């Protein structure tokens, strides 16, 4: 989950899907657009991801028109140097358009509301009294993170339009209070794409659950393309299919361990050039995190190979000249997938640079936007599995 300052965004043209996007099925597209003004902060990014997964450990043992083909395509905004992405979603009748952080590492759908006493001035606030399709739920929700940030409010149900597909009676979480880190963020809230076992309120169906159960998509997958700033930024989420023009070669199918509510996969090894720097470890595919977070021992091996220096805050300083770097290569399933040299720098401060990888105090990795902007992923929550290919 990521929050930061927002500026202007540029719409991304909707792209035509190939026939492979969703055989015999419906799909919707949510494009991503670009914002050049946000400045990254690696230390804050590490603190957010550590807090996010500590929280789960402790609590668990835009298209505005109606889609006629059932394909949901949603564009997303790409922040400065691919740091963050968000998409637009309509909630209510008449609908209010909200900018939401799409996050496969969580499962709640929550956003600022008119009931909020301290939500950010620039945030768009959903008003339940102005929606004809809103219904009260009566239950409360609250999210607290290890860094002290939090949000809380009440539950309700309403119509949610995702890439032109209309979800009926979707449970929504209306924020009544939120921490300053959310108030000053670029988005109005968060749309969780993880499994429903980690929703804050048990038994709540996620938007993906409802897309499937309400028959809005017949192919129960969503494809994720996160554009790189060097290629114009932007990107898109496609619900009900994927866009084969966005990747090279064929998709590699990887089984998913969803026992903790996440898209967990096994990384068989990591290498830089001809040097193997790590053996097998587990990883979570998380579109809501902006820094590649590795297990401590793996991170230090990778840092050593690149001559990076530990900053003792979860980040590494690295040379700003990436032209001499070889890509960081991960073996997943029967294939290898790269994080190229130009993605190894996350943040530049004068003559010093912060690496696009860091470390955490747990034994699994968080494969974030640094990995995902270089590799196309199709998520299938029903099998469960993911399919991965190198971006075109």
Swiss-Prot record:
Keyword Zinc attached: no
Record flagged with keyword Protease: yes
Coiled-coil annotated spans: none
Enzyme class: hydrolase
Gene Ontology BP term (one): proteolysis
Disulfide bonding pattern of the chain: 116-119, 320-353
Positions of the propeptide removed during maturation: 22-69
Active site annotation, chain numbering: 103, 286
Annotated EC: 3.4.23.21
Stretches assigned to the Peptidase A1 domain: 85-389
Signal peptide: 1-21
GO molecular function, one term: aspartic-type endopeptidase activity
InterPro entries hit by this protein: Aspartic_peptidase_A1, Aspartic_peptidase_AS, PEPTIDASE_A1, Peptidase_aspartic_dom_sf
Keyword list, A-Z: Aspartyl protease, Disulfide bond, Hydrolase, Protease, Signal, Zymogen
Catalytic activity line of the entry: Hydrolysis of proteins with broad specificity similar to that of pepsin A, preferring hydrophobic residues at P1 and P1'. Clots milk and activates trypsinogen. Does not cleave 4-Gln-|-His-5, but does cleave 10-His-|-Leu-11 and 12-Val-|-Glu-13 in B chain of insulin
Entry's family note: Belongs to the peptidase A1 family.
Protein's UniProt name: Rhizopuspepsin-5
């Amino acid at each position: 989950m990521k929050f930061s300052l927002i500026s202007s965004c540029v719409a991304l043209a909707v792209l035509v899907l190939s026939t492979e996007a969703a055989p015999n099925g419906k799909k919707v597209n949510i494009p991503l657009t670009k914002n050049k003004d946000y400045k990254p902060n690696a230390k804050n990014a590490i603190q957010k991801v550590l807090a996010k997964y500590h929280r789960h450990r402790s609590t668990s043992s835009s298209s505005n028109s109606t889609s006629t083909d059932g394909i949901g395509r949603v564009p997303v905004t790409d922040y400065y140097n691919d740091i963050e992405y968000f998409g637009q979603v309509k909630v209510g009748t008449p609908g209010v358009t909200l900018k939401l952080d799409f996050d496969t590492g969580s499962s709640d759908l929550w956003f600022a509301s008119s009931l909020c006493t301290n939500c950010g001035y620039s945030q768009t606030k959903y008003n339940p009294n102005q929606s004809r399709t809103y219904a009260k739920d009566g239950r409360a929700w609250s999210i607290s993170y290890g860094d002290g940030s939090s949000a809380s409010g009440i539950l309700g149900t309403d119509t949610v339009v995702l890439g032109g597909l209309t979800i009926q009676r979707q449970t929504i979480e209306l924020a009544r209070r939120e921490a300053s880190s959310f108030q000053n963020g670029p988005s109005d809230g968060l749309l969780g794409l993880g499994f429903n076992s980690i929703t804050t309120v048990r038994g709540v169906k996620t938007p993906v659950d409802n897309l499937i159960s309400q028959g809005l998509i017949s192919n129960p997958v969503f494809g994720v393309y996160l554009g790189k700033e060097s290629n114009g930024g932007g990107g898109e989420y496609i619900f009900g299919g994927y866009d084969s023009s966005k990747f090279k070669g064929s998709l590699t199918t990887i089984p998913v361990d969803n026992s903790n509510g996440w898209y967990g996969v096994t990384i068989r090894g990591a290498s830089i050039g001809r040097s193997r720097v790590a053996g097998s470890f587990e990883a979570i595919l998380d579109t809501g995190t902006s820094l590649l977070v590795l297990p401590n021992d793996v991170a230090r091996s990778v840092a050593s190979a690149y001559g990076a220096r530990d900053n003792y805050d979860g980040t590494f300083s690295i040379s700003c000249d990436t032209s001499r770097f070889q890509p960081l290569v991960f073996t997943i399933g029967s294939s290898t997938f790269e994080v190229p040299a130009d993605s190894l720098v996350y943040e530049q401060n004068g003559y010093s640079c912060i690496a696009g990888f860091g470390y955490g105090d747990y034994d699994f990795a968080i494969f974030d936007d640094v990995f995902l902007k270089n590799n196309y992923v199709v998520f299938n929550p029903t099998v469960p599995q993911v399919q991965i290919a190198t971006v075109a």
